[in-house]
């Protein structure tokens, strides 16, 4: 890289421009009917920020996305202040877990993998993610033809 001064601005001019190689394959890409991403956190501000980031990334890739907020889960622990005595003196702790569910519909496998890798690499601290993929598959050959066409003629005559 070479720095070129241009009216007190530095412009990055690349010397050797090499194009990235694009690989193609003959295998058909997997199709997903739905991609469900459940994001969990304890801090609402972090969760709101991450939801905004994930929705913005999906819109940039042209993916349709829906977001809904399941009810939060609150776990409470009641402990004695003292280990051995004073049963009346207790302390309560609680953990509030907030959830966001991101629903992506009708994706190709390559788009889904690129999107998931991007949002997983930018996952903030204290945030957990669960991904559920619903794949579209072709119907097997033994199920395609109706059952009554595979029954032999002898069984049909004996029932009549």
UniProtKB/Swiss-Prot annotation:
One Gene Ontology term from the biological process aspect of the record: mitochondrial translation
InterPro entries: Ribosomal_uS10, Ribosomal_uS10_dom, Ribosomal_uS10_dom_sf, Ribosomal_uS10m
Subcellular location: Mitochondrion
One GO CC annotation: mitochondrial small ribosomal subunit
Keywords of this entry: Mitochondrion, Ribonucleoprotein, Ribosomal protein
GO molecular function: structural constituent of ribosome
Signal sequence segment: none
Classification via PANTHER family: MITOCHONDRIAL 28S RIBOSOMAL PROTEIN S10, SMALL RIBOSOMAL SUBUNIT PROTEIN US10M
HAMAP family: Ribosomal_uS10
Family: Belongs to the universal ribosomal protein uS10 family.
Subunit structure: Component of the mitochondrial ribosome small subunit (28S) which comprises a 12S rRNA and about 30 distinct proteins.
Protein name as it appears in the record: Small ribosomal subunit protein uS10m
Organism this protein belongs to: Mus musculus
Gene: Mrps10
């Amino acid at each position: 890289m070479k720095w070129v001064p241009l009216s007190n601005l530095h412009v990055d001019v690349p010397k050797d421009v090499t194009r990235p190689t694009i690989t193609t394959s003959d295998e058909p890409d997997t199709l997903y009917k739905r991609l469900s991403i459940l994001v969990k956190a304890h801090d609402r501000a972090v969760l709101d920020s991450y939801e905004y980031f994930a929705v913005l990334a999906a819109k940039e890739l042209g993916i349709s996305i829906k977001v809904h907020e399941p009810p939060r889960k609150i776990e409470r622990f009641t402990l004695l202040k003292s280990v051995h005595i004073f049963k009346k003196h207790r302390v309560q702790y609680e953990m509030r877990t907030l959830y966001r569910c991101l629903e992506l519909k009708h994706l190709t496998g390559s788009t889904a993998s690129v999107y998931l890798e991007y949002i997983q690499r930018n996952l903030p601290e204290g945030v957990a993610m669960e991904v559920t993929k619903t794949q579209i598959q072709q119907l097997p050959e033994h199920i395609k033809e109706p059952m009554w066409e595979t029954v032999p003629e002898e069984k049909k005559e004996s029932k009549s």
